[in-house]
A protein has these predicted regions:
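Membrane-anchoring hydrophobic helices of lipid-metabolizing enzymes
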Residues: 1-100, 104-114, 120-138, 150-153
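Non-catalytic C-terminal accessory region of glycerolipid acyltransferases
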Residues: 2-24, 132, 143-244
């Protein structure tokens, strides 16, 4: 998209507040939304439609870790790329709901009011939104090690009988559109544990030109992940190659 000065300008994708606020009853009752229906509605708001390459690289079984760069910027919430990937999995593997179980952050930075630091309302809200959308909420910042351990044990327990991919943005919220970042601390161990449970990693590179573009690469087998000095860095290297 070109601006008047010939410089490429990023498109803006308005936050789908109607859909987000529609989760309120689930948050209040502790119930869950259809991730298939929710993500389909999010994708329908993306204009122009996103491009997806390399679907043929997805493995025969949906039992894997779906990994991608955290493609978020001003005017583009990470919800949009996550929804596109969720619907791509839905189309490839059929009527799974949830098509993907994403691992999401469980805490926001504290608010600053003058010299004081106040816990963010997101600390209360995010775990409840995560539950409503079948996500695993994991605080990766080290703020609550016991809670992190409980969340990761749940991921690993479910991985043994997973019928759908586990979704992960290894960079976390520090990831910025178009700029590869280091994976979060602990992601290496998580990927290695999941690999030992038999889950390969499926790298996807997200980029943007005239539209959002998703490039699905070759699957990284469990043996390659467990043999790597750092499984998370290996995954991010493959993702970086797909972003070009």
């Amino acid at each position: 998209m070109e601006g008047t000065n010939g410089v490429s300008q990023a498109r803006r994708y308005p936050v789908p507040w109607g859909l987000v606020l529609g989760l309120a009853s689930h948050i209040r009752k502790g119930t869950r939304e259809s991730v298939d229906r929710f993500s389909e509605a999010v994708v329908s708001r993306i204009d122009p439609p996103p491009r997806i390459e390399g679907v043929e690289n997805l493995p025969p079984s949906p039992r894997f870790v779906l990994t991608a760069n955290h493609f978020q910027r001003k005017g583009l919430w990470i919800l949009f790329p996550a929804a596109v990937l969720t619907q791509a999995i839905r189309r490839r593997y059929g009527a799974l709901d949830p098509p993907v179980r994403w691992i999401v952050t469980a805490n926001w930075p504290p608010l600053r009011i003058g010299p004081w630091r106040v816990p963010s309302p997101g600390d209360w809200l995010l775990p409840r939104v995560a539950h409503a959308l079948w996500c695993y909420e994991v605080p990766f910042t080290g703020s609550d090690p016991a809670r992190t351990a409980r969340s990761l044990r749940r991921v690993l327990r479910d991985a043994r009988s997973a019928g759908a991919p586990i979704g992960l943005f290894p960079e976390g919220v520090a990831g910025t559109a178009g700029i590869p970042n280091r994976p979060l601390p602990g992601v290496d161990r998580l990927l290695a544990h999941l690999a030992r449970a038999g889950l390969p990693a499926q790298p996807v590179g997200i980029r943007e030109d005239s539209a959002l573009a998703f490039r699905i690469g070759r699957t990284i087998p469990p043996a390659e992940l467990t043999a790597a000095p750092d499984a998370a860095r290996l995954v991010m290297q493959r993702i970086g190659e797909l972003m070009r």
